[in-house]
């Protein structure tokens, strides 16, 4: 099944809800970055959370999330847009612990760390950016997105993200949900939301069992009839890197740096952090870039 995200209203229009299956997308990220279990779970959770923030944006806006904890995984970076296109990378892809956490799951908190920052940069278009930053509160990532939304954007939310990793490090299931309270929500509605959240199985297990974004939202809302579906968006791993972009980056290094590439290395190879694609520049190509540099 192809990955997709569903936006809806629930609780008499008092909550905006999102759910997504991202299994194929996270499989692609795992394949590109050769991530081991804990790194896969952390990267997949971050990418899914970033996907939800991207889905909140306007058509031409982009969002970049960086989670920088004190654990062995190092910084995790993901970016997404309103069209469901997402990419991401983790600094140390080879983190695996033989011991599970107290809940019997992969110990993502230990991998990410419990001290550090979650940063969000919104590219609003026209060269205008908005940056928000909150401390990591758990290292489990879903709770950290929840805290960011409440603190930096003043939106009371609940974010649940999960990745089920097979013993051979392949991805079995991935996805998540996000619920946001809208102004006017009553105490009764909040109580009902809390009750439904408590009864919700873990995201990755729901997706492994074949649940769709629509059926996850129905559980979240307390019934399919209580949902007003707004939009369905395809989700995929997409990277917009290109040789031209890397050429521009090389030009920005300046003539001295390019001269050293020509004289010492007789060429250059650039690798995209996000997708691991590589771009080779011959000595002749570097000479052309040298002429364009200042």
UniProtKB/Swiss-Prot annotation:
GO biological process terms held by the UniProt record: protein refolding
CDD domains: Hsp33 (cd00498)
Family matches, as Pfam families: HSP33
Cellular localization per UniProt: Cytoplasm
A molecular function GO annotation: protein folding chaperone
Tree of life domain: Bacteria
CC annotations in GO: cytoplasm
Keyword entries, A-Z: Chaperone, Cytoplasm, Disulfide bond, Redox-active center, Zinc
Main location: cytoplasm
Disulfide pairings: 239-241, 272-275
Modifications the protein undergoes after translation, according to the UniProt entry: Under oxidizing conditions two disulfide bonds are formed involving the reactive cysteines. Under reducing conditions zinc is bound to the reactive cysteines and the protein is inactive.
Signal peptide start-end: none
InterPro entries linked: Heat_shock_Hsp33, Heat_shock_Hsp33_C, Heat_shock_Hsp33_N
Role played: Redox regulated molecular chaperone. Protects both thermally unfolding and oxidatively damaged proteins from irreversible aggregation. Plays an important role in the bacterial defense system toward oxidative stress.
Family membership: Belongs to the HSP33 family.
PANTHER family in the record: 33 KDA CHAPERONIN
Identification of the protein by name: 33 kDa chaperonin
Organism this protein belongs to: Listeria monocytogenes serovar 1/2a (strain ATCC BAA-679 / EGD-e)
């Amino acid at each position: 099944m192809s990955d997709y995200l569903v936006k809806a209203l629930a609780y008499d229009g008092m909550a905006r809800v999102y759910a997504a299956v991202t299994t194929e997308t996270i499989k692609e990220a795992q394949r590109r970055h050769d991530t081991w279990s804990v790194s896969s779970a952390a990267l997949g959770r971050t990418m899914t959370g970033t996907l939800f923030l991207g889905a909140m944006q306007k058509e031409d806006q982009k969002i970049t999330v960086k989670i920088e904890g004190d654990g062995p995984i190092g910084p995790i970076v993901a970016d997404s847009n309103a069209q469901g296109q997402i990419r991401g990378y983790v600094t140390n892809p080879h983190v695996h612990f033989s011991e599970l956490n107290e809940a019997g799951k992969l110990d993502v908190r230990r991998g990410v760390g419990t001290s550090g920052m979650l940063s969000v940069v919104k590219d609003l278009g026209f060269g205008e950016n908005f940056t928000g930053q909150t401390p990591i509160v758990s290292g489990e990532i879903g709770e950290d997105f929840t805290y960011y939304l409440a603190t930096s954007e003043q939106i009371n939310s609940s974010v649940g993200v999960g990745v089920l990793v097979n013993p051979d490090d392949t991805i079995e299931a991935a996805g998540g949900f996000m619920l946001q309270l809208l102004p006017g929500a009553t105490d009764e509605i909040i109580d009902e939301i809390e009750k439904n959240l408590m009864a919700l199985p873990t995201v990755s297990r729901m997706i492994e069992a074949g649940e769709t974004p629509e059926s996850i939202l129905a559980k979240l809302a307390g019934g399919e009839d209580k949902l007003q579906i707004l939009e369905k968006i395809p989700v995929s791993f997409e990277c917009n890197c290109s040789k031209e972009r890397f050429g521009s980056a090389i030009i920005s290094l300046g003539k001295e740096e390019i001269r050293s590439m020509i004289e010492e290395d007789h060429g250059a190879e650039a690798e995209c952090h996000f997708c691991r694609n590589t771009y080779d520049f011959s000595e002749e190509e570097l000479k052309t870039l040298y002429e364009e540099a200042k």
